[in-house]
Amino acid sequence: MKKNLIYPVLFLTSFLLSSQEKTSYQIPKKELLELIDVELAPTVIKDSKNENMVLLYRDAYKSISDLSQEELRIAGLRVNPSKYIGSRTTYYKNVKVLKLSNSKEPNQLQGLPLNPKLSNFKISPDESKIALTNTTDEGVELWIADLKTLSAKKIYGSNINSTLGNPITWLKNNNELLIKTIPNSRKPLIDRNSIVPTGPTITENEGQKAQNRTYQDLIKNPDDAFNFTQLSLSNIIKITLEGKQKNFLNSKMYRSVSVSPDGSLVMVSFIKTPFSYLVPYYRFPTEYRVYKNSGDLVK
């Protein structure tokens, strides 16, 4: 009887051990892989003079590494808090340029980093260059692509703040840009999973009845408000194509930066407190200011 019981026990033990083995992701068969992993048609940027067509290439699917990145959902945003860029950002892996006047095949843009994650493309006013960002393990870098020489170079390190959208604005002289950067005064984010609440979250409607739209990923408490502030604060610096930089505007929660047609004025918008717990960041109180190209406020 004991001997008969031994075999089922051994079988069950071996089954449990095999089921606990760590299994890695598997690559499908070649036929299936070729069917799924088809190169997408490139995204196109074309200048107004019909001289250059910039072709942006990306993978059909995000990598497991990209999907496993940290994500913070706050104020209607989904942000990678360690890199200050949207966690759902579409990244491009290659850039080619087609000369519409004399080329039938696109030319490779030279000088791009190895395994790049490119985004935030902005063409210069004279349409001869494109500014773009490259996201690395350290953060977001600024790169410039010259459409005449078909070469790219990095001009600013891993400190760009892309939390509230594209951080790049060209100035009209085609030699300078305004970029949003992470301030040195930033504070560590609050980890909600490691703290005990000290009180309830309270909202008031002053006794009024009103319809209210619902949104995802809103600010829910003071800790969320603190984290949103730290992620959104940025300085605006002026930088040349040679990488020379100087401070333009001090730290605020800048949403947008735009330049007047003659290039003499810069208008910025920035978010102000108090934050709403009912709507996303783009419906928060916003102030607009106009500055001279020198950084002096226009009164």
Predicted regions and their residues:
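Beta-propeller folds
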Residues: Y7, S19-K299
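Generic N-terminal leader/processing signal
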Residues: M1-K2, Q20
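Sec-dependent signal peptide recognition
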Residues: K2-V9
